[in-house]
Design a protein with these regions (language model features):
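Short amphipathic alpha-helical interface segments
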Residues: 24-38
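Residue-level marker of alpha-helix boundaries and capping positions
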Residues: 20, 47-48
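Short, basic interhelical loop/turn and adjoining N-cap
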Residues: 50-55
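Short acidic, hydrophobic short linear motifs in intrinsically disordered regions
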Residues: 38-47
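Charged/polar, solvent-exposed surface patches and flexible loops
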Residues: 31, 46, 95
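DNA-binding patch around the recognition helix
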Residues: 2-23, 57-102
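Aromatic side chains
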Residues: 32, 48, 80-83
Length: 102
């Protein structure tokens, strides 16, 4: 399978062409992170209908996307994780997606 890589000073961001096709949940979550810089499991369920956001985040991390996990509690004490895109990645990820789409 064809792949695309973008080298940066510290990391290589790489993806197989099929792994980030438009319309996949992985791509939808990545674009959500690019637009809003964060996502929670509840958001992913409500917006994209997926209950496995942690698995998609793990896959994105394995491609070199730097995502941090911020553990939080709501007003009722229920714990959840907010996934945050690390600053400075938006341009290189958009470049990768543009190359994949062409």
């Amino acid at each position: 399978m064809d792949s695309v890589s973008i080298n940066t000073k510290y990391r290589v961001l790489r993806a197989d062409v099929g792994s980030l096709q438009k319309g996949t949940i992985r791509r939808e979550i990545l674009e959500h992170l690019l637009d809003r810089c964060s996502i929670t499991s509840l958001e992913a369920l409500g917006v994209y209908g997926t209950q496995r956001v942690a698995a998609r985040i793990m896959e994105l991390r394995s491609m070199g996307v730097e995502i941090t996990s911020d553990r939080r509690s709501d007003s009722m004490g229920k714990r959840y994780v907010k996934y945050l895109l690390r600053p400075g990645q938006v341009r290189r990820i958009r470049t990768l997606l543009k190359r994949l789409d062409s």
